[in-house]
Amino acid sequence: MPLPCDTILQAALIVTQDDARTVIEDGAIAIHEGRIAAVGQRDAIVGNWHGVTVIDMGESLIMPGLVNAHTHASMTLLRGLADDLPLMDWLTGHIFPVEKGLTGELVELGALLGCAEMLRTGTTAFSDMYLIEDATLRAVDRAGLRCLAGEAIFAFPSPAYADPETAFDLVRAQHDRWKHHARAALAVAPHAVYTSTPAILARCRDLAEELGLPIHLHLAETATETAQCIEQHGARPVPYCDGLGLLTPRTTLAHCVDLTEGEIDLLAERGVTVAHCPESNMKLASGIAPATAMLGRGMTLGLGTDGAASNNSLNMFTEMTSCALLHKVHHMDPTCAPASAVLDMATRGGAHALHMQGIGRIEAGCPADIIALDLRAPNMQPIFNPASHLVYAATGHETRLTMVGGEVLYLDGCYTRFDMDDLLKEVRKARTWAMEQVRAAR
């Protein structure tokens, strides 16, 4: 007699991203209480399981939801506000002045817009570092994605705190509010070496240990950052942070562009994870992170979009394409960054960066964080190697279904938890606010 389950999801092709990287033709997934109960051939699943709901995606490819290992979701409101500038000019001359006027309502609005974009392009979980992260998590709670959120901690006031001394209590309070949430988690997020002091970084380390939280930090993003760190602290960013005890297996470092071979060895030895953000690094001309060298040392890399103000999208499919092509031409080696490795970064690697067990793969016992892509799209046919299509052909807009914890959040153009038209009306109002902030900063 068939076993009961909540949902049976069927499709022409399933890319599991399990340890064997199994691909199943004419497959199905049994989902119960938010987790995958079984995955296999359609006939076997339908014969062994009885679903209350059956969703037949037909000529679609089912795969794990993508994981954005580093972003600033609310910066969707600043998309296109300032472009074609070096990182520090972009930050200090344009972004920071506008961010001074942020409110919780604006952060929540921008984060919800970011969630909508991610759901529309197949992302089910993301690691966020920004301001007023309680507001980001309210948007996450509304939209239904998973999120590891870190309040950016600076050596100066932010819209979330007037005194940096209070930032640590703020993070404690955020942790207390969200620690039992099924899809949200907290990280300790010192913004960067150049916006912190040794004392603040040490307190971030201690707070992470106290609360059992991971650390999320921008590091070694540019040569300018390195030069400044040497001038102020007498060391390059990686050894400087290592001396402060920040580099552990619970640490995810965003960017890691300006690294020496010895620093790559040190990061590998410490077991840190790196969030590689190729499109943002290219757009800001920050450089090319030595991703292939890090992978060669056995390091785990996730893939991140960075914020929509420096990318300018949160689309993980286009990020995969850029990642693969960038490293091939950089090394003049077409075997660099193969599709399978890049797909791993966007799924399993991202799951590792978020410290969320079981996401980024489709296998029994794992959370049912699943997306389905339309194989009827002209750019998706004919299909020989699914990983190749996902990295080199898919654009993200083939996404038909996005599911988190067995719950359908997006299906064929419709969001199930919020009204997109209402959201866009509020976003248009926020554009007016942003332009006023720009004029006031001049």
From Swiss-Prot:
EC number: 3.5.4.28, 3.5.4.31
InterPro entries linked to this entry: Amidohydro-rel, Deaminase_MtaD/DadD, Metal-dep_hydrolase_composite, Metal_Hydrolase, MTA/SAH_deaminase
Co-factor requirement: Zn(2+)
Keywords on record: Hydrolase, Metal-binding, Zinc
Catalytic activity from the UniProt record: S-adenosyl-L-homocysteine + H2O + H(+) = S-inosyl-L-homocysteine + NH4(+); S-methyl-5'-thioadenosine + H2O + H(+) = S-methyl-5'-thioinosine + NH4(+)
Function, in words: Catalyzes the deamination of 5-methylthioadenosine and S-adenosyl-L-homocysteine into 5-methylthioinosine and S-inosyl-L-homocysteine, respectively. Is also able to deaminate adenosine.
PANTHER family per record: AMIDOHYDROLASE-RELATED DOMAIN-CONTAINING PROTEIN, AMINOHYDROLASE SSNA-RELATED
HAMAP family according to UniProt: MTA_SAH_deamin (MF_01281)
Family per similarity comment: Belongs to the metallo-dependent hydrolases superfamily. MTA/SAH deaminase family.
Protein name: 5-methylthioadenosine/S-adenosylhomocysteine deaminase
Organism, as annotated: Nitratidesulfovibrio vulgaris (strain ATCC 29579 / DSM 644 / CCUG 34227 / NCIMB 8303 / VKM B-1760 / Hildenborough) (Desulfovibrio vulgaris)
Gene symbol of the encoding locus: mtaD
